[in-house]
């Protein structure tokens, strides 16, 4: 009796082509001629990256990354981003492989990190989808040890219930803990005046006669003017204000004592041509401001009027 042999289904292949390869029909036709079109599918990488194409799940045994018309993988690898590798990894069968058309290694390429994040494992110059079996990702969780006196389940799978009353747990009242140094106010106290302290008895005569200890910050420093603190309480701020007032009064007194007599003034005839400013228009309403002008600082005057200067050394 002849023994029937089980025939394994043909392996399906997915070709991922860059956009420039589709523009060269002759190059694309020569690539497709090497594969059986009945078990081979062709998809464009730009359409996969844009989400325009949805790949079937667990369908392909092999996914090949095609080179462009110049036989370079640069364009294809640039389009193999996370949006492409995720669907490609899902479309691979367990133990399915992702590799390049020319067989060059992809482990050192730019898509190595994204391929690992998509769930693929580096293997023989490409990437392979691990086979986790039927219990893919199943992990048994134990939520505690089995109790010793727990009743066994019945034949139908039901578990008998235990309706024994549990002993009530005695709840002890919580005693508040008072922190150390904390007291309580006796509200029954009438707070008589006898309990108050006389402020006059806090300091004796000897305490009042003691010299005031000036802080180091308030003591005079060599070469610097004394400065009072912001919240000065030693009297330094008041003394500094008093000293400033005395200096200002003395300066005002000296200023008032400077007065010029009639003999200190000089008469000038402006009909005589003398020194003029650089613009020659000092009498048009502005004060004299030119450097070296004998009238610098004086108010403006009209031509020909008599002017008295405060300086006898003017040369006209």
From Swiss-Prot:
Q: Which GO terms describe its molecular function?
A: 2 iron, 2 sulfur cluster binding; 4 iron, 4 sulfur cluster binding; electron transfer activity; metal ion binding
- Keyword 4Fe-4S listed: yes
Any single Pfam family the record assigns to this protein: DRE2_N
Renumbered to this chain, region (Linker) spans: 140-208
Q: Fe-S binding site B: where is this region?
A: 279-293
- Stretches the record annotates as Fe-S binding site A: 218-234
Q: Which InterPro entries match?
A: Anamorsin, CIAPIN1, Dre2_N
The segment annotated N-terminal SAM-like domain runs over 7-139
Report one GO cellular component. Answer: mitochondrial intermembrane space
| Residue ranges annotated as motif Cx2C motif 2 | 290-293
Please tell me where [4Fe-4S] cluster binds in this chain. Answer: 279, 282, 290, 293
Q: Quick one: where is this thing mainly located?
A: cytoplasm
Say if the entry is tagged with keyword Cell cycle. Answer: no
Q: Which family, according to UniProt?
A: Belongs to the anamorsin family.
Q: How does it assemble?
A: Monomer. Interacts with TAH18. Interacts with MIA40.
Biological function: Component of the cytosolic iron-sulfur (Fe-S) protein assembly (CIA) machinery required for the maturation of extramitochondrial Fe-S proteins. Part of an electron transfer chain functioning in an early step of cytosolic Fe-S biogenesis, facilitating the de novo assembly of a [4Fe-4S] cluster on the scaffold complex CFD1-NBP35. Electrons are transferred to DRE2 from NADPH via the FAD- and FMN-containing protein TAH18.
Return the protein name: Fe-S cluster assembly protein DRE2
The coding gene here is: DRE2
């Amino acid at each position: 009796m002849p023994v029937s042999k089980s025939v394994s289904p043909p392996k399906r292949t997915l070709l991922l082509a860059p956009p420039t390869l589709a523009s060269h029909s002759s190059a694309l036709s020569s690539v497709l001629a090497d594969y059986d079109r009945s078990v081979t599918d062709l998809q464009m990488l730009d359409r996969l990256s844009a989400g325009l194409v949805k790949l079937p799940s667990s369908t392909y045994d092999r996914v090949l990354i095609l080179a462009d018309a110049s036989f370079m993988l640069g364009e294809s690898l640039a389009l193999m981003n996370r949006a492409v590798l995720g669907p490609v990894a899902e479309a691979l069968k367990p133990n399915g492989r992702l590799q390049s058309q020319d067989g060059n290694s992809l482990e050192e390429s730019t898509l190595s990190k994204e391929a690992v994040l998509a769930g693929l494992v580096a293997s023989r110059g490409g990437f392979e989808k691990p086979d986790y079996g039927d219990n893919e990702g199943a992990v048994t969780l134990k939520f505690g040890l089995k109790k010793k006196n727990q009743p066994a389940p019945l034949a139908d799978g039901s578990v008998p219930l235990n309706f024994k009353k549990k002993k009530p747990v005695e709840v002890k009242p919580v005693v508040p803990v008072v922190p150390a140094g904390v007291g309580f106010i006796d509200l029954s106290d009438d707070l008589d005046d006898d309990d108050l302290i006389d402020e006059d008895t806090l300091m004796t005569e000897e305490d009042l006669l003691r010299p005031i200890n000036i802080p180091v910050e308030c003591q005079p420093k060599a070469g610097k003017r004394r400065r009072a603190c912001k919240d000065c309480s030693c009297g330094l701020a008041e003394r500094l204000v008093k000293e400033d007032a005395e200096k200002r009064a003395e300066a005002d007194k000296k200023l008032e004592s400077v007065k010029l007599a009639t003999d200190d003034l000089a008469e000038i005839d402006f009909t005589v041509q003398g020194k003029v400013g650089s613009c020659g228009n000092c009498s048009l309403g502005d004060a004299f401001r030119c450097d070296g002008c004998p009238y610098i600082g004086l108010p403006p005057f009209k031509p020909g009027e008599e002017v008295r200067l405060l300086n006898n050394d003017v040369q006209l």
